[in-house]
Amino acid sequence: MRGGTVLLILILLLGVIARSPMTALAAASILALSYLGWGGLLEWIEQNGVDTGLIMLTLAMLAPFATGKVGLREVLLSFASLPGIIAVIGGVLATNLNKRGIDLLSGEPQIIVGMIVGSLLGIVLFGGIPVGPLMAGGLTALILQIYGWLSK
């Protein structure tokens, strides 16, 4: 058994134990594609998966506008409130962290295993919700940068 297969099986098991269906399903899907010999699809997922996932997430965030659950009035009112202004600042900070996460993951893809384990521990110990590796990667990059500053 290849090392990558062993890691995927471990991630699958951790996902099941931690009751994280997204993690378990992702690991099981990649294992299945690998065993079916669908290397081309695996390569496509590796190259385009993050962008495709972000598109799906953005679609989910924009859907309330199309369904009429959120209108222009609500959006404008949110910008006039303290929570709305803080939400804009939070969005700016989050996108910056997410970019750092993508940069870290593309430069050091092996770090994803630690982030997955950390995410699963967050689910089990703190009732967290796994939203993917970007925020975990961004926070990891920020912590590594702070560590770099402090260790000089």
UniProtKB/Swiss-Prot annotation:
Protein name listed in UniProt: UPF0756 membrane protein Helmi_09930
Sequence similarity: Belongs to the UPF0756 family.
InterPro entries: UPF0756_TM (IPR007382)
Principal cellular location given in the protein's record: membrane
Origin species: Heliobacterium modesticaldum (strain ATCC 51547 / Ice1)
One Pfam family this sequence matches: DUF441
Topology class, membrane: Multi-pass membrane protein
Membrane-crossing segments per the record: 6-26, 52-72, 75-95, 111-131, 132-152
Subcellular location: Cell membrane
GO CC, one annotated term: plasma membrane
Keyword Oxidoreductase applies: no
This protein's UniProt keywords: Cell membrane, Membrane, Transmembrane, Transmembrane helix
